[in-house]
């Protein structure tokens, strides 16, 4: 093997290894989550860690952000944040969505095809159920939800918010 080929192989190994470590690193620790954010999970810690590993292994964090962090540096995709998503959708909805062979039929996207939510129908049923349970557990404190809705209303209408 030539010297240049060896260097290229080492570079590839570093990139692949770094990507794998990044996916392991994105399983948030309690310390990282405890930043005074208005988001929380209702799952027991052991279940949450198991679900976070599924989220990480299925590259959800490549596009979606969570716990006030950013999505992976590997892709720049305008995917929705997952913080508080369980305050909007329930476990049954998430399970149906993750089980669909065509998630676009349930929740259409205007993103380019390569950035659209992939189907997770081929995952084992237990994994989809764990992910759905976890996503449904991601709540947002009521005061924050009210303030967010108020800001969105005022932004869209230009009028003061009146519940």
Task: Please name every model-derived segment.
Residues 52, 65-99, 114-122:
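Gly/Gly-Pro-rich "capping" loops immediately C-terminal to redox-active cysteine motifs
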Residues 4-5, 37-40, 48, 52-57, ...:
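Short sequence/structural segments immediately N-terminal
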Residues 68-73, 106, 137-146:
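Inter-heme linker and motif-flanking segments adjacent to c-type heme-binding CXXCH motifs
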Residues 76-77, 102-110:
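Non-transmembrane interaction and regulatory regions of membrane-associated proteins
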Residues 30-56, 70-71, 152, 157, ...:
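Electrostatic cytochrome c docking/interface patches
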């Amino acid at each position: 093997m030539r010297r240049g080929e060896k260097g290229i192989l080492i570079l590839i190994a570093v990139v692949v290894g770094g990507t794998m470590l990044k996916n392991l690193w994105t399983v948030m620790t309690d310390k990282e989550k405890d930043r005074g954010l208005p988001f929380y999970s209702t799952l027991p810690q052991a279940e949450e860690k198991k679900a976070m590993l599924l989220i990480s292994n299925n590259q959800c964090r490549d596009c979606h952000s969570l716990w006030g962090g950013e999505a992976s540096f590997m892709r720049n995709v305008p995917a929705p944040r997952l913080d508080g998503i369980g305050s909007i959708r329930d476990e049954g909805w998430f399970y149906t969505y993750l089980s669909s062979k065509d998630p676009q039929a349930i929740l259409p996207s205007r993103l380019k095809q390569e950035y659209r939510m992939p189907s997770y129908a081929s995952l084992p049923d237990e994994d989809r159920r764990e992910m759905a349970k976890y996503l449904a557990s991601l709540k947002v404190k009521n005061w924050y939800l009210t303030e967010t809705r108020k800001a969105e209303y005022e932004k869209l209408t230009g009028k003061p918010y009146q519940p």
